[in-house]
Every structure is written in C-alpha cells, then in structure tokens.
Amino acid sequence: MAIKKFKPTSPGRRFVTVSDFEEITRTEPEKSLVEPLKKSGGRNAQGRITVRHRGGGHKRLYRIIDFKRDKDGIPAKVASIEYDPNRSARIALLHYADGEKRYIIAPAGLEVGQTVVSGPDADIKAGNCLPLKNIPVGTMIHNIELYPNGGGKLVRSAGASAQLMAKEGKYANIRMPSGEMRLLLQECRATIGQVGNVEHENITIGKAGRKRWLGIRPTVRGVVMNPVDHPHGGGEGRSPIGRNPVTPWGKPALGARTRKKKPGDRLIVKRRAR
C-alpha cells in the first residue's frame, strides 16, 4: 500500500492524502456475508446521545467477519482482498475446501491465491490461526482472544501487532501494541502476523467534509458555549475557565484517570507507558 497525494488545486485538496487501494482486488462484497447496518447517530435505545459528535456519513453494509477462526483443519484459499468501510484494516474473502465462504481480517503480506488454515497443527505462517500454546515465543500476532472460544477481540486495527513474549503455566505473556504486558490463557487463539494496511496511520484527513463522510460531526469547545451547556461556558468575551478543567458532566478532565477496576486487571503484568 502507498499513500497518494494531490496537487493543491483547492484548499480542500492541499493536505488530503488517501490510500492508493492497490491491494484491493474486488469492489463488491460477497452478498451472503453482508447485512444491513442502521445508523444510530450516537443514540442509545432511549434515544439519548451516549456518544457525542456522531451523525450522517455515507451508507454502509456490515461485512460479517469470522473472528473465531474455528474451522479447524480445512484449508481455505484467499479469493480476494477487499475494502471494509467499518474498520481501518482490509478484509480477505476465504473460499474453504468444503465450499463455505468467510471474511477474515487481512494480515500484511497476504495475497490472492495463498492458502490459510486454522487449528493447533497449522504452520506458523501469516494468516494462520492457532492457540497461543502452539505459537513460538517471539512471534508477531493479531486478532487475539481474551477468553477461549470468545473470538478475537484484541489487536484488530490496521498495522497493529502484538508479540508473544513468554509462556508460564497456563498463561502466555503478550506485549500489546500500547506496550502493556498482559497474561492470557494459552488456550486463547491468535492469528499469525501483523494486520495489513500498515500505512493507514499516515493518512491525513485534510478537510472537514471528509470527516462528515465518515459520520463524524464537529467538536465544539466548552469554553465557547453558554453556562447552561457546559461548565466552562459563559463569561464576557474570551474568559478563562475559572476552575480545573472538567467534562460536560462536571468530572475532572485533562489527565484524570478514568479506567474502571475490572477482574481482568490482575492479569496485567505491566501497564502501558502514560
């Protein structure tokens, strides 16, 4: 993948960069693996905004992705590499030997025509999925399960990869992309390799309208609001906040820790660097 730049023929064109999509081999998704995706506009079932700055954006179809990779021992041929509007990574369409079709997250280096397989006896090759106990120490992995048979939850974004650092007892020690060191059960599965579309982090949005295409609305600073709308609001002209910075709901902002305590915290060996 490469990044494409444009001549500055207009202010909106000047800073825009896009992917050249050279790895994409098919433009229409597999019909049997898509379903409708209704936009929520950031609202919950009561109709209240639970996520701000959401709304609009281009229509999308949801591609059903196989995060479990539980079809053991049956080889699958990579039929195509496709764009997925619902994630930063590319997806790969697999044609299994028994006729079934599934989408997976496309790892870096996976090409049309290659064969991938899941299961404890799979080779250590990009795109193959194995339990952590069968993966050599030092291997780069992605799409990692938090619990056995729970489906991949960790390390699924474009260009992301974790590393298997050690195995001890029933746990494997994983270094996450953030630098956090975490223990996971060795029965959990992971896919070999790094997630593809590595250059995604270097793309510049370039203009406000492109954010709107993605369904992201403007973010307004609290200090320019009225007092009824935000704790930072009000005052004559440009005025200071007048208190320690807080969220719209009055909780400490800018540096205050917000992570809740969870039972899984005991499996974190080393926190990420702040």
UniProtKB/Swiss-Prot annotation:
PROSITE patterns: RIBOSOMAL_L2. GO terms for molecular function: rRNA binding; structural constituent of ribosome; transferase activity. Keywords: Ribonucleoprotein, Ribosomal protein, RNA-binding, rRNA-binding. One of its GO terms (biological process) is cytoplasmic translation. GO terms for cellular component: large ribosomal subunit. Residues 257-274 have a biased composition (Basic residues). InterPro entries: NA-bd_OB-fold, Rib_uL2_dom2, Ribosomal_uL2, Ribosomal_uL2_bac/org-type, Ribosomal_uL2_C, Ribosomal_uL2_CS, Ribosomal_uL2_dom3, Ribosomal_uL2_RNA-bd_dom. SUPFAM superfamilies: Nucleic acid-binding proteins (SSF50249), Translation proteins SH3-like domain (SSF50104). Residues 224-274 are annotated as: Disordered. The keyword tRNA-binding does not apply. Pfam families: Ribosomal_L2 (PF00181), Ribosomal_L2_C (PF03947). The keyword Zinc-finger does not apply. One of the primary rRNA binding proteins. Required for association of the 30S and 50S subunits to form the 70S ribosome, for tRNA binding and peptide bond formation. It has been suggested to have peptidyltransferase activity; this is somewhat controversial. Makes several contacts with the 16S rRNA in the 70S ribosome. Belongs to the universal ribosomal protein uL2 family. Part of the 50S ribosomal subunit. Forms a bridge to the 30S subunit in the 70S ribosome. This is Large ribosomal subunit protein uL2. It comes from Pelotomaculum thermopropionicum (strain DSM 13744 / JCM 10971 / SI). The gene is rplB.
